[in-house]
Amino acid sequence: MAEAGQMEKHGFQTEVKQLLHLMIHSLYSNKEIFLRELVSNASDAADKLRFKALSDNSLYGDDSDLHVRVSVDKDSRTITISDNGVGMTRDDVMNNLGTIAKSGTAEFFGQLSGDEAKDSKLIGQFGVGFYSAFIVADEVTVRTRSALDKDARGVEWRSQGEGDFEIADIDKARRGTDIILHLKDDADEFLDENRLRGIINKYSEHLSIPVQMWKEPVPESEDDEGNKVEGQPGEWETVNSGQALWTREKSDITDEEYKEFYKTVAHDFDEPLLWSHNKVEGTTEYTNLLYIPKRAPWDLWNREQQHGVKLYVKRVFIMDDAEQLMPTYLRFVRGLVDSNDLPLNVSREILQDNKITRAMRNGSTKKVLQMLKKLAKDDKEQYQQFWDTFGNVLKEGPAEDHTNRERIAELLRFASTHNDGAVQSVSLDDYIERMKEGQDKIFYIVADSYEAARNNPALEIFNKKGIEVLLLSERIDEWLMSHLTEFKEKQLQSVTRGDLDLGELDDEEDKAEQEKAEEAFKENLERFEKALGDKVKKVRVTNRLTNSPACIITDDNDMSTQMAKLMEAAGQAVPETKYIFEVNPEHPLVQRMLTKEDDTFKEWAEVLLDQATLAERGNLKDPASFVTRLNKLMLNA
């Protein structure tokens, strides 16, 4: 046993205490995952040393046979998971076992609901890793020595998974890490070596690093005929096959194997929604195995967090979260890419601008989009589940990926005036199929909420004529539509921007009536312009309104209302926008206004402008003045 120095006691970071408490209680029904997590971590440590040794073979010393070993001591009620991988320094131990260094940790804890079933899935996505040891152990001891620091001593870390841990320098002869679990009274099942072998076969079969368990010696004996049978010495026996699942033929892999592999690679307790396994040969040769999760990863909206798939080169693990292999708008995709062409000593910098990387990224992106297109066609209910979970991320696609813009647009879903309710289920193809004869544009509106969009006065003429309008109300929607201006040769047109041109949907009689109304109202328009002054860009007769007295419209050359609000929320400077004020001459309120004296008319005009601004923006710069004017007019009514 290693000789320990003076033990120092330290308190866990607050988040670690929370995670330990939640995990021990939420994951209790799935206790066996502790071995999956610890063996996976040990395999990663061996993989990391193998990668480092590509540029410095001396790191192996006299021990280049990388492995993970799992052993049981029934007398002391312990399980030990050992590796001869990269190991840890004292600082590594403090940072990795005493704190949670992940950014977005506070947001993660904020998502927890108190529902054990839901929280267990979320905790699994967060990555329980090492701390899963405390599901089955009431004390954990870690002994480790770094392979990267020749002068480093060993380190021992010890904790009972409560408020604190102890740490000390020790003498440890060999590099790598030993994790000793002192099992709880109710964890006897894990003292059964056959039980542990079964768990390793279930979760770790694909690992390229051998996972070994001790095979007891067989003493010399005699057979039934009295012949001598030689004994066999005890030895470390490899339990997993070591054949990476993705290297096997698809026809030889069961759905159950794909699902179990997903749980390992994604650290998720749920099964995946769907997956795609592809071997690409030709100029660039690689294999990818890509999964779409059922649930959003907890850190989906944390842009500081690296996202991406795992990268292997010729079955050798290179890195996690290789974001260069998958566009940001597909950051929910889990899985791996295994290249036959990249060098083993590849770095993130080399990946950044590399034609092999680009080919793998483009190929993997198309596979994911094809997978989603097929799901949308074959199973609308499952696709709706995907869209409700990941739709807002996919909406980033048209801005990021010009090449696949049309493919992404086919996958988008929207709420619409065609349906009741805010469910986003209408595709652009659905819309085009329902377009009226002579209609050449796809009409949409962006607002703060579904209700604000559905009840916006600018929809009145569309409702009257039975023209469908897409209703957009997510924060990202204005950004999306600024990059998605056309689909299948149909222009996308906001109903609250610029001149409204319904083309052939306006018959000659409608156009003649509009021109006649504009001419008859010309003097009154001048009166409105004088009353409102520089508060508006222009006043004109509307061809959008049938029930409302007025509305405001953004000029084609100005920033839209929703884009301005988006930039303001991000702390960006936004130029002041003056709106076009459209008036409905037929409305009784407008007719009544025209009989008022100029001072009163001015008050009414400003109230109408404020009302129209509220309907479009949802807020006013000076609500107090609006209330004062309205009170005054009501008193004089």
UniProtKB/Swiss-Prot annotation:
- Report the domain of life of the source organism: Bacteria
Q: Which residues cross the membrane?
A: none
Statement: the UniProt record of this protein carries the keyword Cytoplasm: yes
Q: Where in the cell is it found?
A: Cytoplasm
The molecular function GO annotations come to: ATP binding; ATP hydrolysis activity; ATP-dependent protein folding chaperone; unfolded protein binding
Electron transport keyword on record: no
Where mainly found? cytoplasm
Q: Which stretches are annotated as coiled coil?
A: none
Q: Where is this region: A?
A: 1-348
InterPro entries per UniProt = HATPase_C_sf, Heat_shock_protein_90_CS, HSP90_C, Hsp90_fam, Hsp90_N, Ribosomal_Su5_D2-typ_SF
**Which keywords appear in this protein's UniProt record, sorted alphabetically?**
ATP-binding, Chaperone, Cytoplasm, Nucleotide-binding, Stress response
Under SUPFAM superfamilies, the record lists: ATPase domain of HSP90 chaperone/DNA topoisomerase II/histidine kinase (SSF55874), HSP90 C-terminal domain (SSF110942), Ribosomal protein S5 domain 2-like (SSF54211)
Matching entries from CDD domains are given as: HATPase_Hsp90-like (cd16927)
Region annotated B sits at 349-565
Q: Where does the record place the region C?
A: 566-637
- Which Gene Ontology cellular component terms are annotated? cytoplasm
Q: Its quaternary structure? A: Homodimer.
Similarity-based family: Belongs to the heat shock protein 90 family.
Q: Its biological function?
A: Molecular chaperone. Has ATPase activity.
Question: In its UniProt entry, what is this protein called?
Answer: Chaperone protein HtpG
Source organism = Idiomarina loihiensis (strain ATCC BAA-735 / DSM 15497 / L2-TR)
